[in-house]
Amino acid sequence: METTVSLVQMLDARERRVQHQQELLAQYHKPLICFTMNICGPIKDSPLIRRGFARGRQLLRQQFLRAKLTPLYQDAVREVTGCEAFYVLDADPLTIKKFTTDIEDATPLGRLFDMDVIRPDGLKVDREELKLEGRRCLICGGPAKVCSSRRIHTVAELQEKTTEILTEARDAQDIADAARLAVRALLYEVTTTPKPGLVDRRNSGSHKDMNVFTFMDSAAALYPYFEDCARTGRETAEQPAPETFAALRPLGCEAEGEMLDATGGVNTHKGAVFSVGIVCAALGRLDRSLWAEAARVLAEVSAMTAGLTEKDFVGVTAENAATVGQKLYIQYGITGVRGQVEAGLPTVLNVGLPVLEEGLAKGYDFDRASGGALLAILANSTDTNIIARSSRERQLALTEELKALLAQTPYPDKDALAALDDRFIAENLSPGGSADLLALTWLLHFVTTEGNIDE
């Protein structure tokens, strides 16, 4: 809820801020960064403003890492009078001022950052000491002091521009993060080793035309597509969810072409183009605060794909079924990945994600936790790739065998997984559908544990 603040409240907040600065300088005798937001008008705090503030703090943390600096003290307050952050650093004040001005000047969002650097004696470091010009106006780009003192622009104009800057920065960060986490998930899936019958660091599984590097090439090529999916979700967020899904389909066709270009014609990620692209679009549709809730993200996936199975299989008969998916649907009622996304990826939410996160919590390395999640997914879903490479009977028998194995050892070790890999290769089995669900499991893990930001 946005609250209008009075001049008295702002003056009181300024007095408290100065007092806190003096206390920190007296305690540490080191330079201090005081970070606030330049927000015009009587509303100084909102979810959008907090997102901008969180991005500013993130950029400061990155500069600290780059300079190998660990703050001696840091804290942040978020009040109706605005957001404030304080950092005490053991470094030269001019060095600190250099990287804070770099942040302020690098992007439009930086124009809303006020990162004061205060020396141990209480004096501020001026931009002029670095031979830098003064801050620029949000509206016209002229000297900010001139525009402010002469009131050249109205409060309404400044508020509109501020909202535009904050919104564009928020959306750009969300879109980039969704795509980054999607590619990261694909890389974690392919590098999980050993995996039965699948490409990994050990071998190419039951495949003759691809290896782990083929998958890396493909994953890298798909980053722009995942950005497009998240952007489409954000741009259509106010429309009915199925409209977002409809807008994805031409993007998916183009992405398949990029994948084939990158791999020399090898189908490495066709399933992921479909399913991971949908999840990226769902993330785009949702406010960032909801990313931490896996069930909410997957509910959006379900809403986007409502009625998909019926639409895609309408008119399909035993006589005209052409694809493996169509034939399995007619013969066994298996809905495959369409049924998974339409139901909100229940195998990911109820099997893959809990098993993966429990394994990581137990201290297992990524390979073992991820391998356990893969087997759990395979044992609790219908992998159409297994059926296509063998039979429905073999797939059913395999799931029962894996359930028995996991009942005794939920997280088989490397030797057990390698032995299973050898068996799958001997039978030419490859659970590609389960591999896609494992990638989605990693994506939801990343989104829920790392996707949320400090607001």
Go through each PLM region and give its residues:
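Long, hydrophobic/aromatic-enriched structural stretches that serve as scaffold segments
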Residues: D228-G284
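Long, contiguous binding/interaction regions
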Residues: M1-A67, R78, K98, D102-D171
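Short, structured motif recognition centered on aromatic/hydrophobic residues
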Residues: S275, G371-L378, L437-L444
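Short, well-structured hydrophobic secondary-structure segments
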Residues: L32-D92, N211-A237
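A short glycine/serine-rich beta->alpha loop
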Residues: G257-K270, K362, D422-P431
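Phosphate-rich cofactor/ligand-interacting catalytic cores and adjacent structured alpha/beta frameworks
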Residues: E164-A241, F245, L283-D422, T449, ...
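Short, conserved charged micro-motifs
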Residues: D45-S46, P93-T100, W291-R296
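Short, amphipathic C-terminal "tail helix"
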Residues: A426, S430-I453
